[in-house]
A protein has these predicted regions:
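Short, small-residue-biased leader/transition segments that mark boundaries at the very start
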Residues: 2-5
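Beta-strand-rich recognition/accessory modules
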Residues: 17-82
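Extended, hydrophobic/aromatic-rich amphipathic alpha-helical segments that build helical scaffolds
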Residues: 43, 135-149, 257-262
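Structural helix-adjacent loops and short alpha-helical linkers that scaffold large soluble proteins
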Residues: 79-83, 104-105, 125-135, 146, ...
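Active-site-proximal, well-structured secondary-structure segments within enzyme catalytic domains
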Residues: 86-129, 153, 158-168, 226-228
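Solvent-exposed loop and edge beta-strand segments that line ligand/cofactor-binding
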Residues: 123-132, 169-178, 244-255
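Carboxylate/His-rich catalytic cores and anion/metal-binding grooves
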Residues: 139, 146, 178-229
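Active-site-adjacent "gating/activation" loops or surface patches in catalytic cores
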Residues: 213-261
């Protein structure tokens, strides 16, 4: 299926593979699976958004994203679940296994279920080892989130990562340069996740042309001469917004570009 909103095209397709039972189409819009022993649902989605530094493209390509979606599904449709899982695990562990953390010679296997550990920490009933394990788990959970939401060729992790459940998410799922985006990316180099830093680097580069324009409009010299450098403020997004989002003082934060380039 495809959806187009103001030149933005969103395409998505599903492939449903059943073992036993049958699949039927209902009302031309729904798939009905009956009496199956198991089903595997493969989903691919894409848009015509292109992150670039050339305003003439207006961030949209002329390509139909449905073709990319179909090509992706064609590559995996005949693969077994075990093969897909193995590919995923190999890809994930190539990053996750770059470092290990062990606080006090703890076993790598869970010492207790996570919900039990969280409850125990809240109620102060955990042992020292259980709390250490939970802290270690929480540390690695942060790495998991970044590995899952910031990969080469993608956009950087925003306020909700890739887990926004709505078409319009809180704070527009954008980027806040006064602390949030830094909190997402501070761990990349210290925890050996350099490849996950690349989307952030490319995103910063894409802001430069609009940032130069904003700097000229807001901070031009008294004699009207050109300013040097570029700027972005409290909020920015994938559409190149670098101006203050509102008139309030917190939004007038010209140090955003400096923060991101540290």
């Amino acid at each position: 299926s495809e959806m187009c909103i103001r030149d933005r095209i969103y395409a998505q397709q599903l492939v449903v593979k059943n073992k036993g039972g049958k699949i039927s189409v209902v009302d031309g819009t729904k798939l009905k699976v009956e009496d199956a022993d198991e089903i595997i649902v493969l989903m691919s989605a894409a848009t015509n958004y292109v992150q670039c530094m050339d305003d003439s493209y207006n961030y949209f390509s002329q390509e139909d994203p449905l073709e990319k979606v179909q090509a992706t599904l064609h590559k995996v449709a005949d693969k077994k679940y075990t093969a897909l899982l193995a590919t995923h695990q190999k890809d994930y562990h190539s990053l996750y296994d770059r470092m290990r953390l062990n606080l006090g010679n703890l076993p790598e296997a869970p010492v207790a279920p996570t919900d039990s550990l969280l409850k125990g920490m809240d109620e102060n009933t955990n042992s020292e080892q259980e709390n250490q394990y939970l802290e270690m788990l929480y540390f690695q959970f942060g790495r998991y989130l970044l590995i899952s939401s910031s990969r080469e060729g993608s956009l950087p992790a925003n306020l909700q990562g890739v887990w926004g459940e709505r078409l319009s998410n809180p704070w527009n799922a954008d980027y806040h340069t006064n602390i949030n985006i830094q909190m997402n990316y501070w761990p990349t180099q210290p925890t050996n996740l350099s490849p996950c830093h690349l989307p952030m680097v490319e995103y910063v580069r894409s802001l430069v042309p609009r940032g130069k324009y904003t700097a000229q409009q807001y901070y031009c010299k008294p004699d009207g001469g050109n300013v040097r450098g570029w700027v972005t403020h409290h909020e920015n997004n994938i559409w190149g917004n670098t101006a203050p989002a509102k008139k309030s003082t917190p939004h007038h934060f010209p140090a955003g570009a400096i923060w991101m380039c540290q």
